[in-house]
Regions:
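Short, contiguous alpha-helical
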Residues: 8-12, 16-19, 30-68, 101-127
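A structural signal for long alpha-helical coiled-coils and helix-turn connectors
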Residues: 26, 33, 93-96, 126
Length: 127
């Protein structure tokens, strides 16, 4: 497995971890604040994750950053979040990572970093 394939595998694993977390949360938890952290509510965190996935995936496809946008209009509704997480996972997996340029690889690493940073914030739920 080359580096590009490893990067895609790590993105897939990070995406699955996010999905699994949301799957196991009660919908009421989406309105909770993260303890001892000046941050968005969990729904806001998930909106940011989805927006980053959509925006970075588009940037990877286009070979350059095209700005941030998020289609998740209802981040407090668990089913909507799960469906959108599934859609962004599918979209990422449609990209052939073997032929990526250095710029595209950097964008993919930025997406991975963003997802993992949110994991670091969301794990505070478990305290």
């Amino acid at each position: 497995m080359n580096v590009n394939q490893q990067l895609k595998a790590k993105l897939n694993r990070a995406f699955k971890l996010t999905y699994d977390l949301v799957l196991h949360l009660d919908e009421t938890c989406l309105n909770l604040d993260l303890p001892n952290l000046p941050s968005n509510r969990i729904a806001g965190q998930l909106w940011c994750i989805v927006g980053a996935r959509e925006s970075y995936t588009k940037a990877i496809e286009m070979g350059e950053w095209k700005g941030f946008s998020c289609s998740l209009a209802t981040p407090k509704i668990k089913k909507s979040v799960l469906v959108t997480l599934e859609e962004t996972d599918k979209k990422l997996n449609e990209i052939d990572f073997m032929g990526l340029t250095d710029v595209q690889i950097d964008l993919a690493f930025n997406l991975l970093e963003h997802e993992i940073q949110h994991h670091g914030q969301l794990v505070r739920l478990c305290k």
